[in-house]
Amino acid sequence: MNKLAFIGGTGVYDAGILSDIRSEIINTPFGQAACQIGYFKGKEIVFLARHGTEHTIPPHKINYRANIYALKMLEVSSIVSTTAVGSLNTEYKPGELVLIDQFLDMTKSRNGTFFDGEFRGVAHIDMTNPYCQTLRNVIIQAGMKNEIAIHPNGCLLYTSPSPRDRTRS
């Protein structure tokens, strides 16, 4: 059975939808990560607040490697993550879901890999299709079933290594 984790971004801070929630601090080789573990319809789900349980960690200080490693330690096999973003596409309306299938990461201030030669050696990872198509299909089908507007393709551009938001340009 696959174990699912949700990583909540700005606006998604807690696992209130889960029952029998317990909080755990997971110690990883990269630091600590705080997780909430609970149940939804009998299935164990892990919730991790990207900005911390009290939303006190700004974007440029998030310990992504500790967070992902903690989920691995908890035997999570699938991750769904939310993020608060703006869009240049006027077809996207507030409240609609854009299920990105590509991304460009232009940030430079964080270590974005486990394969930098220090921890796991050096590896080259194919990022042609960086997201799990099976999980994407499940989300698309659930959206259709529940009449949620989902745009099945999109590219997310990460540019800011700080809490700064976009400009009008």
Provide a role label for each language-model segment.
Residues 1-127:
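Metabolite-binding pocket within alpha/beta catalytic cores that recognizes anionic/polar moieties
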Residues 60, 152, 163-165:
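A generic "cationic amphipathic patch" detector
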Residues 66-69, 134, 138, 164:
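Short Gly/charged-rich anion-binding patches and loops
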Residues 130-160:
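Active-site rim beta-loop-alpha module in soluble metabolic enzymes
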Residues 158-169:
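Single conserved hydrophobic/aromatic residue that forms the stacking wall/gate
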